[in-house]
């Protein structure tokens, strides 16, 4: 498209990016919409396609896109007042920009992002629905702050456990529970294959938060997200002591423990791309990853050369502790749990074990339906000092329209946003890989779990899940040197102790009174 210009920022330093953006866009043409975009696993073809159609429908408007694999520069440019973009697509909403004013020179912006509430609540042109109504309720609520909206979604980002069907034995069954996942890992080892491969530098084992949520339940996790501890007290270090957090860590401990041999021996040395390719090549049977692996397959493998799929997230076996009607020995409780999972999955001939209550069935049903998503964090914004906010908002409305959604899906090769739409339409399925078809189908069937970490106690302090004053939990759990190893329980306790020691500072930073 001849009116499009690609301002490449790949591999440039922050200083060079600053120079390009401030120099290349010095004219700030009133009819040109400048967009900065992160170019990662989802690519930016969809953005160019949307921009091209937007130009056609808005005579006289030109869209120029600056794409970069280093979106860390976006935040610096925004808060320094040097951003020349009218729209920025990045990977995290950075709530401090909303909760705190930003001073640029002699001007104070509170907040520094443009208020999008008007287009969130207005009918999308040509449709009888609003942007707010097109978003799942949990995502809409995540973006809402004191009745206003400042962020716009641009990806779905499902994560979970993938398995390679090219090396999968027909005698193996997909695990219904974490105990079955561990048993499967043993079976795979006995068959002379490697159960898992990952990169310790960037492991994506963060999916273990789903096991924590399965155990605790959505109500308890919502309380945690609002700063409540298990004892009901708010803004206390005991916030980190939900039992399910330790239970989830214990599952991860078994999977990663060096002496168990469930993970490829090179997992601690390879980078993420290498680990991903090793999985796709069949060097390991399973991997924790996200739907963006599709792009890696397209880039490095011929069509039909790979065959992978997400499994439903296994239910944490210790969930039986929360289900009083599931009784018996540990083996009997696991068997009953598996039977209930079959029942909620709708497996052929599945029946409920005697005595299991409907309340416990629904608790397990909720747990089984959870799949992690990080798409809610893939958000775009308009700098409040942009001089083309009306055009930028119009672009957002177009992107959220049915037409815009279809353009996004087709141009991206099957990826989707969080906006609700009939993604199963045949015209969208044509040309999409079998992996993306199965991924989108599972996405539709699942409840999408994410940990907001939006409350000020998290977003203004940098508080992490189970890693406060610690390095990544995978480093401890996979350590072969006993001096470097920490068990799940040790991590759980150390995280709490570190929070307890610094809690006054956390409260002060978050501006929360006792």
What kind of region is each of these model predictions?
Residues 405-406, 417-514:
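Conserved C-terminal helix/tail region of periplasmic/extracytoplasmic solute-binding proteins
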Residues 29-41, 61-66, 86-87, 196:
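Short, well-ordered beta-strand elements
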Residues 1-34, 56, 501-514:
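Short, low-complexity disordered leader/linker segments with a strong preference
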Residues 56, 123, 143-209, 217-270, ...:
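Helix-loop-helix "hinge/cap" segment bordering the ligand-binding cleft or interdomain interface
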């Amino acid at each position: 498209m001849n009116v499009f210009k690609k301002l490449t920022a790949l591999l440039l330093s922050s200083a060079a990016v600053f120079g390009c953006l401030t120099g290349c866009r010095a004219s700030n043409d009133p009819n040109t919409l400048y967009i900065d975009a992160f170019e990662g696993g989802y690519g930016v073809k969809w953005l160019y396609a949307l921009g091209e159609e937007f130009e056609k429908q808005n005579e006289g408007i030109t869209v120029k896109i600056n794409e970069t694999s280093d979106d860390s520069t976006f935040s610096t440019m925004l808060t320094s007042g040097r951003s020349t973009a009218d729209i920025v697509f990045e990977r995290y909403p950075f709530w401090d920009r909303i909760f705190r004013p930003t001073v640029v020179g002699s001007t104070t912006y509170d907040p520094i992002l443009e208020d999008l509430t008007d287009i969130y609540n207005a009918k999308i042109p040509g449709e009888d629905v609003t942007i707010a109504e097109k978003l799942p309720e949990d995502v809409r609520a995540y973006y809402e702050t004191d009745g206003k909206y400042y962020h716009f979604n641009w990806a779905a980002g499902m994560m979970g456990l993938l398995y390679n069907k090219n090396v999968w034995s027909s005698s193996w069954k997909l695990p219904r529970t974490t105990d079955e996942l561990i048993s499967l890992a043993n079976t795979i080892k006995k068959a002379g294959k490697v159960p898992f491969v990952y990169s310790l530098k960037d492991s994506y084992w963060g999916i273990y938060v789903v096991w924590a949520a399965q155990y605790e339940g959505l109500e308890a996790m919502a309380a945690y997200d609002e700063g409540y501890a298990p004892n009901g007290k708010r803004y206390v270090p005991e916030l980190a002591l939900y039992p399910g957090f330790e239970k989830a860590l214990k599952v991860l401990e078994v999977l990663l423990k060096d002496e168990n041999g469930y993970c490829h021996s090179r997992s601690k040395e390879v980078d993420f791309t290498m680990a991903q390719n090793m999985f796709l090549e069949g060097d390991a049977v399973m991997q924790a990853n996200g739907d963006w692996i599709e792009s890696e397959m397209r880039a490095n493998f011929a069509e039909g050369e790979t065959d992978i799929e997400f499994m439903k997230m296994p239910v944490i076996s210790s969930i039986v502790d929360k289900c009083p009607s599931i009784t018996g020995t540990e083996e009997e409780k696991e068997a009953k749990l598996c039977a209930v999972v079959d029942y909620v999955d709708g497996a052929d001939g599945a029946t409920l074990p005697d005595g299991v209550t409907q309340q416990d069935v629904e608790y397990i049903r909720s747990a089984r339906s959870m799949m992690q998503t990080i798409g809610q964090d893939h958000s775009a914004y308009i700098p409040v000092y942009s001089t083309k906010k009306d055009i930028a908002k119009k672009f957002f409305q177009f992107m959220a329209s049915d037409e815009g959604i279809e353009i996004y899906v087709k141009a991206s090769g099957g990826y989707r946003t969080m906006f609700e739409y009939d993604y199963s339409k045949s015209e969208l399925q044509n040309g999409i890989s079998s992996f993306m078809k199965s991924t989108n189908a599972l996405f539709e069937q699942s409840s999408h779990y994410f940990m907001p970490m939006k409350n000020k106690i998290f977003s203004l302090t940098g508080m992490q899940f189970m890693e406060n004053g610690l390095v990544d939990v995978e480093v401890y759990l996979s350590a072969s040197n006993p001096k470097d190893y920490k068990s799940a329980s040790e991590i759980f306790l150390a995280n709490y102790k570190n929070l307890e020691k610094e809690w006054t500072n956390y409260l002060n930073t978050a501006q929360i009174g006792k």
